From Swiss-Prot:
Keyword Nucleotide-binding: no
Pfam families on file: ZapB (PF06005)
Gene Ontology CC terms, in alphabetical order: cytoplasm; membrane
Protein known as: Cell division protein ZapB
Residues covered by region (Disordered): 43-64
InterPro entries in the record: Cell_div_ZapB, SNARE
Family: Belongs to the ZapB family.
Quaternary structure (record): Homodimer. The ends of the coiled-coil dimer bind to each other, forming polymers. Interacts with FtsZ.
Keywords of this entry: Cell cycle, Cell division, Coiled coil, Cytoplasm, Septation
UniProt keyword annotation of Cytoplasm present: yes
Length: 81
């Protein structure tokens, strides 16, 4: 009977260790999910920022082209004079 009690206590200890390990792993999983969500939000923000910069860049290029056209027109008028 003492032998089976020892076996039972060892089994109980191993089960408790398994439960503790599972609990820790679940906590780790939740932490990693939160980090993953935060990173996904950062990626989304970065993509939005990039798109905004691309639009701004395109507008600036169009403005530059407009100014270059005006400058060429002015230079053409000066040559006529």
């Amino acid at each position: 009977m003492t032998m089976s009690l020892e076996v039972f206590e060892k089994l109980e200890s191993k089960v408790q260790q398994a439960i503790d390990t599972i609990t820790l792993l679940q906590m780790e999983i939740e932490e990693l999910k939160e980090k993953n969500n935060a990173l996904a939000q950062e990626v989304h923000s970065a993509q939005n920022g990039r798109e905004e910069l691309e639009r701004e860049n395109q507008q600036l290029r169009e403005q530059q082209n407009g100014w270059q056209d005006r400058l060429q027109a002015l230079l053409g008028r000066m040559e006529e004079v």
